[in-house]
Amino acid sequence: MSKVIGIDLGTTNSCVAIREGDETRVIENSEGARTTPSMVAFADNGEMLVGQSAKRQAVTNPANTLYAVKRLIGRRYDDPTVTKDKALVPYSIVAGDNGDAWVEAQGKKYAPSQIAAFVLGKMKETAEAYLGEPVSQAVITVPAYFNDAQRQATKDAGRIAGLEVLRIINEPTAAALAYGLQKKNGGTIAVYDLGGGTFDVSILEISDGVIEVKSTNGDTFLGGEDFDARVISYLADEFKREQGIDLRADKLALQRLKEAAEKAKIELSSSKETEINLPFITADASGPKHLVLKLSRAKLESLVDDLIQRTMEPCRAALKDASVSAAEIDEVILVGGMTRMPKVIEAVKQFFGKEPARNVNPDEVVAIGAAVQGAVLKGDVKDVLLLDVTPLSLGIETLGGVFTRLIDRNTTIPTKKSQTFSTAEDNQGAVTIKVFQGEREMAADNKLLGNFDLTGIAPAPRGVPQIEVTFDIDANGIVSVSAKDKATNKEQQIKIQASGGLSESDIEKMVKDAEANATADKAKKELVEARNQAESLAHQVEKSLAEAGDKVPASDKAEAEAAIAAVRTALEGSDAAALKSASETLSQAAMKIGEAVYKAGQAEGAAGAGAPGAGATGPNGEKVVDADFEDVDDKKSA
């Protein structure tokens, strides 16, 4: 039975884990790291780079290096948060054909789900390399406060990557699952999850293998990227004040600032001050300019203090929805790389009135929880029951544009709820059901998930027809809605797809593109391996020829030299088959050289057998043979 992997698809970094027996293992990638940058780059030669290789070349290729794309998943292009993001990144955010926010690299448009799929593909490869077998099933985590459109887009990303997504699980819930599995005693816990791009807080109760989410809250556009942006702005402002040049206008300089800001932020978690030194950051008529600046922890904290305070309001709301006070929280778990910042730890400690638990790795615990959930779904882990909730209220638009809730936020999922509505006009033959998600009282202020029409309603005065609307939320938090006319039993049902979202044909095309990319990547890998083998073989044979000298017959030597020349010619091209063929010919020639050297060695040995050193003739002509003598202990021979 194939393994189910757990993937933490992060804004900044991603992580993959697997449950093996009673242990959950985080899998190292090909570079030996336990987390992989959620970055995808497209080089000028058309090659796609994912992870660390993409990050390494970001400074020289900023316009085609895509990062933090998770923040765009399931969002419309005209979303205010997208407009804000456009000013912060060096790559292009464009409008997709469906009105969603897409990205552009090397002149080609990509859906955020596609970019996420490339990262998931890297996680899949990492797991397959470790397991030595194909992987087709996964549990993928999302921020708890992701809406339906964002969850659906994440599931689409898994499908594009060639994965069957068995479950979409909330990140804080996954962390609690990993934590709860090792915790013997029950209790009420708070998970404070501040990652690269999103913030979530969940209140959970753990008791006898049951992990129940009581409430969740958060902000899907608040994370480490925003902290970096504050540092970037500070550096750019300081440089402009000193040199009169705005570095924000230079994409290459902006990418260097981004890397320096992230590095400084990390360093200031363990030191009080750091120096940012960026030589040749730009130039003007007077010559090159360098950025050299000291940044203290106190200055960083003052730059981001309001961002840290923004996380406190969701914490208050989560406690209120769970009907518990901060004093009733038994333990606080910190998740996400940003929770390493001392100021964040201090703020959490102050809010909850207790020291946060330090026995979990904030970068890995979510992936571990996802792997545990995968094992639960496979039946490998028993006696664990996970009860999650829907983060936002669901309802429809009714007369006057009012948002009428059918399912309140923090309702345990899966769940199903029905409510009966009627028509607003006499003889109304059809109704349009508009489905919204959010907490505002007017429908227009909430997120429109989708709409559909129920037609063929029997003519009747307003208020008479009975139209039953049913909401069904599955364990992934994905919504289906149906409407039925009770008089005619006519029913219309839709699985909610974002008002933009990817169509089935879009997804199928992207799956094919991903498969084509995988084939191309395999071909590139084969070519690289063939090149390496050919170069190594050519060098080896040249060395053998030089060492052998005249021991090799002229015909064999000429054949080997011709084979080496053929390999060198093939190395100039990019035909793996031609390289392999030339290498095979050279390999045969190498064998002949080896045989010739061996025969020459044997002949020398045979000739040397009768030489003076091997024996001598005595004075009377008799043969005297050299012999080795060994002293023997008399006692032993007695």
From Swiss-Prot:
Gene that encodes the chain: dnaK
Single annotated GO MF: ATP binding
PROSITE patterns: HSP70_1, HSP70_2, HSP70_3
Residue pairs linked by disulfide bridges in the UniProt entry: none
Keyword annotations: ATP-binding, Chaperone, Nucleotide-binding, Phosphoprotein, Stress response
Cross-referenced HAMAP family: DnaK
Pfam families, per database record: HSP70
Function: Acts as a chaperone.
Modified residues (Phosphothreonine): 198
Protein name: Chaperone protein DnaK
Up-regulation conditions: By stress conditions e.g. heat shock.
Residue ranges, annotated region (Disordered): 604-638
Originating species: Gluconacetobacter diazotrophicus (strain ATCC 49037 / DSM 5601 / CCUG 37298 / CIP 103539 / LMG 7603 / PAl5)
InterPro entries: ATPase_NBD, Chaperone_DnaK, Heat_shock_70_CS, HSP70_C_sf, HSP70_peptide-bd_sf, Hsp_70_fam
Key word Transcription present: no
Compositionally skewed regions (Gly residues) per UniProt: 607-618
Similarity-based family: Belongs to the heat shock protein 70 family.
